[in-house]
């Protein structure tokens, strides 16, 4: 499976244990940990030996500086980025906690992803000193459990950890944030981690037996390990499976779909407590790529891939809201939206690093007696995160975030209007001139089980003259053959 190897560490200082566990997690992680899926994607690897051994029980130890690591990363990208688009970077610099300003390595990774059109996955970092975090978290931790560099990279997908296994004596229970997993937010209060996945647990005596994740050692034996280093490749595997299924490869779309899956899976969790997003990010994506890429009949997922220019906006009037979700003059249903884009970045502005903002509104318009049309968005940003004042929106919301999440369960109904509309707006900081910005908007509308709202919406769009295409995947092509 290793198609290329670059060695920047002399053989006597090499330790392949960490990377072997990571690669085995990408390739066989579901099987090794009893996580059933019929999909068996197999991937090829470019193995970059860049970081020397740091464990004296294994052999001689050495270290590497940040600048040297940056030089290695760029050299590797020069050689491989045209064909290798997904990169796992399970590392963290413990003494560089993200305290509000961007780290040098985070900025560098953003540059690399823009320059070479690749997607990098970064671990959120581990708490490596006692006490570890309980759940709910103890207040005495302060900022000790904040993410560390380079987990603040805006372009990277940062991955935290939750427990797969638990016991009577475990520090946390299944699906709770692992006791070592560093939390957000990132710089400028951007949501970090982006997603979480299984990365292990510990007993109160700090034993991992039966609580860690299973992977392979350098001899092919099954062993247990813990850490966000091992939750990160699980997210990589899911992203790579989505990307692999795409007939037309699209990194931004794959990123949006991964995070949208996480958000829709975690909607109850994130509604329980607004602070949960600091630990879970947008949640945990589905194990199966087909679950992410396909819809059931009782829901419809629409993907919009477009550009918006400065000083203008995009609108889609007369959106066909499902008739089966309209009762007694009111709209019902469950709506989740994920907006993904790549804002202009400028490290000269510190906390105002992200220079452009895109917003989406999806809601009802009504024509007044004077003939004017009134429109109001009905699907808010995360609960209690959308404030009117700039400082609050930056601290508590997603105004300058490259990923935005909107969600509403319409249980009491919304008074019927003249129709539904989608509106996309873009603005920039200090009104600087910026080029058109690409974005991906994913909207899922869910109804009661057994109600075919998928056909209602798709037929409604076609009746209104909108061109719709199914997202073509390799699975569909295989089925046709």
Indicate where each model-derived feature is located.
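Structured lumen-facing ectodomains of secretory-pathway proteins
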Residues: 119-193, 208-209
């Amino acid at each position: 499976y290793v198609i290329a190897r670059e060695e920047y560490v002399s053989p006597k200082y090499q330790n392949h244990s960490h990377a072997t566990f990571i690669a085995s997690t990408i390739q066989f992680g579901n099987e090794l940990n009893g996580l059933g899926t019929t999909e068996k994607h197999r991937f090829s690897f470019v193995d970059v030996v860049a970081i020397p051994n740091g464990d004296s029980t294994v052999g001689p130890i050495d270290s590497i500086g940040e600048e040297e690591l940056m030089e290695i990363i760029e050299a590797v990208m020069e050689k491989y980025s045209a064909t290798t688009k997904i990169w796992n970077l399970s590392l963290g610099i413990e003494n560089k906690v993200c305290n509000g300003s961007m780290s040098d390595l985070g900025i560098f990774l953003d540059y690399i992803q823009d320059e070479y059109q690749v997607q990098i996955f970064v671990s959120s970092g581990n708490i490596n000193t006692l006490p570890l975090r309980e759940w709910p978290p103890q207040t005495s931790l302060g900022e000790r459990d904040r993410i560390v560099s380079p987990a603040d990279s805006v372009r990277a997908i940062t991955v935290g950890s939750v427990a797969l296994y638990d016991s009577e004596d475990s520090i946390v229970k299944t699906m709770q944030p692992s006791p070592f997993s560093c939390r957000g937010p990132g710089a400028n209060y951007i949501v970090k981690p982006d997603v979480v996945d299984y990365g292990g647990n510990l007993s109160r005596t700090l034993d991992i037996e039966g609580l860690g994740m299973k992977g392979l050692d350098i001899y092919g034996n099954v062993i247990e390990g813990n850490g966000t280093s091992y939750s990160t490749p699980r997210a990589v595997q899911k992203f790579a499976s989505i990307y692999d299924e795409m007939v037309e490869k699209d990194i931004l779309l794959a990123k949006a779909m991964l995070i949208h899956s996480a958000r829709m899976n975690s909607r109850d969790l994130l509604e329980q407590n607004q602070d949960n997003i600091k630990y879970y990010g947008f949640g945990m994506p589905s194990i199966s790529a087909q679950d992410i890429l396909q819809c059931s009949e009782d829901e419809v997922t629409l993907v919009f891939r477009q550009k918006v220019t400065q000083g203008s906006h995009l609108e889609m009037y007369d959106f066909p809201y499902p008739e089966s979700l309209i009762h007694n003059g009111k709209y019902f249903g469950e709506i989740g939206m994920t907006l993904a884009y790549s804002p202009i970045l400028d490290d000269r502005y510190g906390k105002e690093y992200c220079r452009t903002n895109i917003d989406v509104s999806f809601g009802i318009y009504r024509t007044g007696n004077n003939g004017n049309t009134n429109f109001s968005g009905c699907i808010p940003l995360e609960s209690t995160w959308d404030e009117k004042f700039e400082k609050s929106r930056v601290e508590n919301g997603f105004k300058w975030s490259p990923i935005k999440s909107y969600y509403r369960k319409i249980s009491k109904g919304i008074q019927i209007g003249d129709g539904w509309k989608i509106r996309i707006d873009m603005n920039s900081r200090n009104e600087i001139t910026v080029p058109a910005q690409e974005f991906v908007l994913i909207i899922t509308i869910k109804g009661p089980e057994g109600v075919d709202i998928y056909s209602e919406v798709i037929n409604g769009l076609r009746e209104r003259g909108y061109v719709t295409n199914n997202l073509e995947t390799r699975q569909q092509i295989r089925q046709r053959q």
